[in-house]
C-alpha cells in the first residue's frame, strides 16, 4: 500500500513533536522529522512515539542555522528510497533572546531569528521541491504566528497594552508568510498555506505567557496539532492555497 510521506522540521519538541505524533498514529504514514541531534532526540522520547501499522518515523539531521543541511537530508532520504514528499511542514523556529522594543533590539539576535525562521525555510523548500513535485497532491505548510499579520498589528499592539511584541519574531514570521505566497504563486501544482498554531503550552509559549502576566498559554499543543492536521487534510489548491489560517481554519488577513 502506498504511504503518505510527511516531512516536519523541528520534530523534537513543541508543536513539531505533536504533529509527528499525530501523523504517526495514522496507518501508512512515513514521518520524516528533522532534529539537531538524532541521538538526543531518540533518548528524549521522540523515537518511542507509537506508530500505526505501516507507519514509521525517520529522523534526519537539520541544524536550523545551516542552510546546507536540508539538501543533505534530502540526499539521505533518497538513499533510503524516500523519493517523494506529500506534505512538508516548515515548523522549526526560535523567538530570540528576549522581547524588546525595536529601539532596544540586538542586530545580531534579529539576524539570527530571520535566518532560522525565514531563510532556513527557503533552503528547505529549495531542497524538498523535487520530492514534492513527484507527489500527486503536494502540500507545503508554513507554521507562522498571529504576530505575523500586518493587518492585525495595531489591534494586537493595543490588546497587549502597548507592550513590545517581539518585533524580531513577528518580522521573521511575516517574512515566512511572504515566502509562502511566493511559493504559492510560482508553483501551480502545490497547495501552500501559512498557519498560526495558536498560543501553545510549549517552552516558547510558556515564556510568552509569563511575559504577559498569564499563568499559562490558553492552547494545548496536542489538541492544536490535531486541528492543524485536520486543516491540512482539507486543504486544496482552490480553497486554501495562498492563504493564512488559524489552527482551527479561520482565515487571517496578511
Walk through the language-model features, giving the residues of each.
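Rossmann-fold scaffold of SDR-type NAD(P)-dependent oxidoreductases
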Residues: 9, 84-93, 117, 142-144, ...
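N-terminal Rossmann NAD(P)H-binding glycine-rich loop of SDR-like oxidoreductase domains
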Residues: 9-12, 16-24
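Conserved glycine-rich Rossmann-like NAD(P)H-binding loop of the short-chain dehydrogenase/reductase
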Residues: 24-43
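Rossmann-fold cofactor-recognition segment
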Residues: 49-68
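A glycine-rich helix->loop->beta "capping" turn
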Residues: 53-58, 76-88, 96
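Conserved Rossmann-fold cofactor-binding substructure of NAD(P)-dependent oxidoreductases
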Residues: 63-83
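Catalytic loop of short-chain dehydrogenase/reductase
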Residues: 93-122, 129, 133-185
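C-terminal helical subdomain
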Residues: 189-190, 194, 202, 206-254
Amino acid at each position: 500500500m502506498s504511504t503518505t510521506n510527511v516531512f516536519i522540521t523541528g520534530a523534537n519538541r513543541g508543536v513539531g513533536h505533536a504533529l509527528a505524533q499525530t501523523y504517526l498514529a495514522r496507518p501508512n504514514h512515513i514521518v520524516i522529522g528533522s532534529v539537531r541531534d538524532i541521538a538526543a532526540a531518540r533518548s528524549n522520547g521522540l523515537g518511542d512515539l507509537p506508530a500505526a501499522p505501516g507507519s514509521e518515523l525517520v529522523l534526519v539531521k537539520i541544524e536550523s542555522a545551516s542552510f546546507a543541511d536540508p539538501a543533505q537530508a534530502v540526499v539521505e532520504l533518497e538513499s533510503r528510497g524516500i523519493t517523494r514528499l506529500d506534505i512538508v511542514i516548515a515548523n522549526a523556529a526560535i523567538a530570540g533572546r528576549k522581547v524588546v522594543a525595536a529601539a532596544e533590539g540586538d542586530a545580531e539576535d534579529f539576524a539570527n531569528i530571520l535566518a532560522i525562521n525565514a531563510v532556513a525555510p527557503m533552503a528547505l523548500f529549495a531542497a524538498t521541491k523535487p520530492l514534492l513535485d513527484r507527489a500527486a497532491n503536494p502540500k507545503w505548510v508554513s507554521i507562522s504566528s498571529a504576530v505575523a499579520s500586518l493587518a492585525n498589528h495595531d489591534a494586537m499592539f493595543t490588546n497587549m497594552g502597548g507592550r513590545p511584541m517581539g518585533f524580531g519574531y513577528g518580522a521573521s514570521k511575516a517574512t515566512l508568510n511572504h515566502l509562502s505566497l511566493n511559493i504559492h504563486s510560482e508553483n501551480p501544482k502545490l497547495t501552500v498555506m501559512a498557519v498560526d498554531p495558536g498560543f501553545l503550552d510549549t517552552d516558547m509559549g510558556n515564556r510568552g505567557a509569563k511575559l504577559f502576566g498569564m499563568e499559562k498559554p490558553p492552547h494545548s499543543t496536542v489538541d492544536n496539532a490535531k486541528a492543524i492536521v485536520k486543516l491540512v487534510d482539507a486543504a486544496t489548491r482552490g480553497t486554501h492555497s495562498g492563504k493564512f489560517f488559524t489552527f482551527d481554519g479561520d482565515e487571517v488577513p496578511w
